Amino acid sequence: MTAAAFLLAAAVVSAQQNRADAPLVVNVVNVLPVQGNIYMLVGAGANITASVGRDGVLLVDSGTAAMTGKVLSTVLQLATALTASPAPIHCVGMHCPGTPYGWSSPSINAIIGSPAPPKPIRYIINTSLDPDHTGGNERLSVLPAESKIVGVTFPPVGIAPSAIVLAHENVLRRMSEVPEGKKESPIPVGAWPTDVYHSASYKLSEFFNGEGVQIFHQPRAHTDGDSIVYFRYSDVISAGEILSMTSYPVIDAAKGGSLQGILDGLNHILDIAIPEFRSQGGTMIIPGHGRLCDTGDVANYRNMIAIIRDRIQDMIKKGMTVDQVKAAKPTADYDGLYGSNTGPWTTAMFIEASYKSLRAK
């Protein structure tokens, strides 16, 4: 990591530490260096994974539509900070490098020593079709030069004329579905994936920022189109909605999700990840929501899901109804960490979705 990039990320951490008692700041995209080429962007909806380097920028998920301007501004700042400029050259004269070839002069040296422009966003990989994962697709993937977003004028350099938006084919199928009684999908065409894969795994055809990028389809997990993205050299996994440190996993049964699929996805992540020592360090995992994780965190979350599954499955075998299962509180010892009685995904909703998923097996 360059000094400029370190200072950019450290400024966020320092500001948060110095204002520990201050009110929570919203509508801000924070940057967390993970390891290797990988950075975690927090505050734009779902967590965004960014690979930034010599080949440009690759994003895993794009956040909400409302935060697109802040995401782009943050990505451009990060890409600029990571563009290592040559050391300034002040030498002029016969003994300076390049003089025999006729290109040593104050003007030429200034050009050589100037920083390179930031590289463009070249890929966006969607781990699911949720709006907080795909909301920025349209404006981040195709953005005309000199456009203005939230009062910031972006130069022609650093903005891709067209980035590839990649996802599993089921994401495109569901985003392009036309609701009954309607003439077109409510999701604009510009937000749809431009490239899809349909196999159990997929990899970019060449190294990106000096490493291989591998994508795994996880069927019937949060939905039927979930992807896990693995950066092989940086040793970082982007887990999407399969892993959340702020809630129980969201099971969207209407879109092909299931509790067992979530559990299978967590086991898949643990199969890929290698800890450094005692399940700590080593492979780092970026969840769909919440803090950065290591193997131990994923294993604890997996164990929690397995225990709750077994409890609900046992209650189903005893003939208990969904209301009886809710009353029995099979999640009680984990509610302090992941439970909620309000918001878009409550504990009761998780229990009901798990019950229906296990009954359908």
PLM-predicted stretches and their roles:
Residues 1-11:
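Bacterial N-terminal signal peptides
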Residues 13-15, 20:
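Boundary at the C-terminal end of the N-terminal hydrophobic targeting segment
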Residues 31-99, 106, 227-241:
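Conserved beta-strand hairpin/beta-sheet module of binuclear metal-dependent hydrolase folds
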Residues 33, 155-219, 223-224, 233, ...:
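Metallo-beta-lactamase
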Residues 55, 66-163:
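Active-site metal-binding motif and surrounding structural segment of the metallo-beta-lactamase
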Residues 212-276, 293:
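Active-site-proximal loop/helix segments of hydrolase catalytic cores
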Residues 236, 260-320, 324:
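Divalent-metal (often Zn2+) His-rich catalytic cores of metallo-beta-lactamase-fold enzymes
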Residues 317-361:
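C-terminal regulatory/interaction regions
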